[in-house]
């Protein structure tokens, strides 16, 4: 016959099977198998008077104990056995016998059908109803035919063991949920601190990060940004507060398609606004104090210049115009500083300068020359001291700002190092887990090999003993054979001499002995081959013992990795302590800023009080006349006139030559 090679490219297609008929036949066969098994078990129960279905949960319990001992250790397996034993005792003592047998049998059969591939469907439900009906109608009442005392512990185990497994499942579910909750809390805290550290960075770095994010999103094809951000890039937004409020809105719009992350991102945006609002308010307050101080200085200069201008225009203008001018000068910087917190605009200064120049440049210069020393003479020493204190406070404020910027840079560097350390920690943990898995597998293989070695050594000893026993038997058989041959020769000689009757029996005996000798030699050869195979296996196992040194190297590497992880954890804890110290220093700097701002407000209040006192003193002083020798062009006018003073309810006469108190 010729051998034909099959062509793989021209294989025949298998016949198509109808899935509907296959499913029907498979399901019917499966449920028929269930019914046959159930009927056989019931028949065995009735014949042997024992509930054999109770042995299945006991077998499951033994398997679970073996698995727990294999994977979780001896302590957990002992604990599991104790818990199962206590639950069995409770079910045995507190549940009535009939209900105990009914619940155990129904649970076993329902669980047996539940573990099929079909799951919950109409045939399984019908089988459950049949099992429950048979148990409740027939077997619930007939307990006299069974060995109740023998079956009762197994029935209690059929109920107690599932209760224990359900308890462990519930405990694992609760621990899983608690772990998830703890992870979410830690994630929220990390996001909060990360956002705080990002907001602590300088605005230039924030803008750079923002531009990089926008470039990445534009490259990915995300939707367009909000118009407010485009205006900010064009230079429309002057403040930092709009940036802080625009960031969460952008994140919310970009990630609005993901329904699960919507609420989380929105809450994070709100938290970011709440964090940024106090920082922006502090910055605005500092700017307001600086602008207020500058406005006060400008106000003092403008008061002196307006007094000179008003003296020049006293001959031509009425008192109302002077009052309006003074009111505008005095009120405009205050209103600007109170509402906007900014320095008065330079346009008002230019308008006032134009007014002064329109009335005569020479007269204005002379008036300014006369006015400057008078203002310098009228300023008290307290104002000079207050201005010096304000300068010192400004210097302290700038120093605190520099310290704050340095602290923020340190925080950003520490956060970057922390990220690197966390990534290294994750890598080291993964390597540690891999090494532990390798070590566990190596230990398991070592245990298995030890067991195999012990078994093979036992077999080798048994084979050696059998070999020695067979060799002894062979020697004895050889001796017997020699003796029998000698006796046979003698008998043959004797028989040949005397009679020839027993020759046939002796020949048959000799043949049987020869056959037995051949069998023994064959058995001896087989045993020798087995001994050789066992010796080869022993040599292989010895080689494996020599390879166990690699496991020791893995153990040393694992210990080194554990030491490294411990060192990294210690360094991470030290860095967290440094962060806490930096946060405390930042809080102290903010407190010093607040104290400086309070001192500036107190100094401003003292300046206002001193100005009021100066105004009262000027109102009480007598009118002083100046000689016309200084400037022949300017008319003689008093330094202070009653036209410039507003009508007050006091009874003092400012035109009197010498001040006289009122007579009551």
Swiss-Prot record:
Annotated Gene Ontology cellular component terms: axon; neuron projection; neuron projection terminus; nuclear membrane; nucleus; rough endoplasmic reticulum membrane; synapse
Ranges of Polar residues composition bias in the record: 320-348
Membrane-traversing stretches: 28-48, 75-95, 120-140, 154-174
Keywords recorded for this protein, A-Z: Endoplasmic reticulum, Glycoprotein, Membrane, Nucleus, Phosphoprotein, Transmembrane, Transmembrane helix
Subcellular location: Rough endoplasmic reticulum membrane; Nucleus membrane
Gene Ontology BP, a term: neuronal signal transduction
Modified residues (Phosphoserine): 305, 332, 631, 634
Region Disordered: start-end pairs: 252-274, 320-375, 630-664
Physiological role: Plays a role in the regulation of neuronal activity.
Name of protein: Macoilin
Organism for this UniProt entry: Rattus norvegicus
Gene transcribed to yield this protein: Maco1
